[in-house]
Amino acid sequence: MCSAGELLRGGDGGERDEDGDALAEREAAGTGWDPGASPRRRGQRPKESEQDVEDSQNHTGEPVGDDYKKMGTLFGELNKNLINMGFTRMYFGERIVEPVIVIFFWVMLWFLGLQALGLVAVLCLVIIYVQQ
């Protein structure tokens, strides 16, 4: 009869790596542990920080799916979290309004009221028009 520990280890008592694969089996298959190998070469998923480094070193010119992951700013982090929670981007022609801006608009409306928000909106439109 095997103990619970032996069942979890596979019952053969051989050495196992963190994924539960027998090291002897991996060595025989030619996929043994190499201290200098990258996580992908060892058959593991890279950690998120390593993934960020790999994404930032992507010089092929391909667009990165989530540019907020690279930004690391408060705006980017809040926006990424809001999108993950289910908020969507609003599209106005070629302009995109991010969820952070929509939430900011509603908070400003709540604090300042409609007249002050209208004044701020007109000022923003004038600034955008002057910059073009």
From Swiss-Prot:
GO terms for cellular component: Golgi apparatus; intracellular membrane-bounded organelle; membrane. This is Uncharacterized protein FAM241A. Belongs to the FAM241 family. InterPro entries: DUF4605, FAM241_domain. It is a single-pass membrane protein. Pfam families: DUF4605. Keywords: Membrane, Transmembrane, Transmembrane helix. The chain crosses the membrane at residues 100-120. It is found in: Membrane. It comes from Homo sapiens (Human). Residues 1-68 are annotated as: Disordered.
